[in-house]
Amino acid sequence: MLLFSSLPVLLLCVVTASYSEIKTCEDAQKTCSVITCGIPVTNGTPGRDGRDGPKGEKGEPGPGFRGSQGPPGKMGPPGNIGETGPLGPKGQKGDPGDTSGVEAKLANLEGQIRILKSELDHVKKLQTFSLGKKSRKKLYVTNGEMMPFSKVKTLCAELQATVATPKNAEENKAIQDMAPDVAFLGITDEVTEGQFMYVTGGRMTYSNWKSNEPNDHGSGEDCVILQRDGLWNDISCSSSFLAVCEFPA
């Protein structure tokens, strides 16, 4: 009974005490920069990151300096060839060149030519014994082939020689001794019938005709051959006889 009669008094004391504490905190907040009132608590864990916001607009160029020049790019394909430009003006006359080197080379070349000429003379001497026959300043050679007169002329011309043409008894004998068979001579009357001429030009000055020759038998015998006995006979130029060429010795 006593407990129930004292209950109102106890409630009043609790309320009064709580009010006094709240009042004290409010007064303290007015005079202190930081005062913790009530029961102290700890901070919670950080929350999750929020979603990315929308993309912003492009900003203005910054005030930074221009960077250094980059490396050159790859070479492009070659272009088309342009048109030829106009002819330039004539240049000034140059100074005279140094000919001392040229003169030395020329002297050396002349020396080599002399050596070659000496060797060529030696070869000609060998040919005299192995391929031909020499008579004074002429060398007669043959390849041993039989052919028409036109081909004999061509062959000798290619060798820078002429068809063998004896102009005296000594040369006639030299050709006779060298030729193993009947041979053409460089004498014809193709231009004027009956008037025999040298193929190199000029009228014939020496002859050694066989008896009753030339007779132009059957007409068309415009060429001359040297028989094995050394006598001459006129014959058709289309016939084939030994080719003998004449070189200056």
Swiss-Prot record:
Query: Which Gene3D superfamilies does this entry report, sorted A to Z?
Result: Mannose-Binding Protein A, subunit A (3.10.100.10)
Example of a GO biological process term:
positive regulation of phagocytosis
- Binding site residues for Ca(2+) 2: 213, 215, 221, 233-234
**UniProt keyword Calcium present:** yes
Range of residues in the leader sequence: 1-20
Origin superkingdom: Eukaryota
* Residue positions where 5-hydroxylysine is found in the record: 55, 58, 90, 93
Record has Protease as a keyword: no
Could you tell me in which tissues this protein is expressed? Detected in blood serum (at protein level). Expressed in liver. Weakly expressed in lung, testis and brain. Not detected in bone marrow and heart.
Bias (Basic and acidic residues) occurs at 48-60
**Where is the stretch described as Calcium-dependent carbohydrate binding?**
213-221
Concerning PTM, the database record says: Hydroxylated on lysine and proline residues within the collagen-like domain. O-glycosylated. O-linked glycans on hydroxylysine residues consist of Glc-Gal disaccharides bound to the oxygen atom of post-translationally added hydroxyl groups.
Q: Where is this region: Disordered?
A: 41-102
Query: So which residues have sugars stuck on them?
Result: 55, 58, 90, 93
* Domain Collagen-like residue range list: 64-98
Q: Name one GO cellular component term.
A: collagen trimer
Subcellular localization, per the record?
Secreted
Q: Which UniProt keywords apply?
A: Calcium, Collagen, Complement activation lectin pathway, Complement pathway, Disulfide bond, Glycoprotein, Hydroxylation, Immunity, Innate immunity, Lectin, Mannose-binding, Metal-binding, Repeat, Secreted, Signal
* All residue ranges annotated as the C-type lectin domain in the record: 135-246
- Domains as described in the record: The helical collagen-like domains from three protein chains assemble into a coiled coil and mediate trimerization.
**Subunit structure comment from the entry:** Interacts with MASP1 and MASP2. Forms oligomeric complexes of 3, 4, 5 or, predominantly, 6 homotrimers. The homotrimers appear as globular heads that are connected to a central hub by thin stalks.
Q: What does this protein do?
A: Calcium-dependent lectin. Plays a role in the innate immune response by binding mannose, fucose and N-acetylglucosamine on bacteria, including strains of A.suis, H.parasuis and A.pleuropneumoniae, and activates the lectin complement pathway. According to some authors, it only binds mannose.
Q: What is this protein called?
A: Mannose-binding protein A
**Species lineage, top-down?**
Eukaryota, Metazoa, Chordata, Craniata, Vertebrata
Q: Name the gene.
A: MBL1
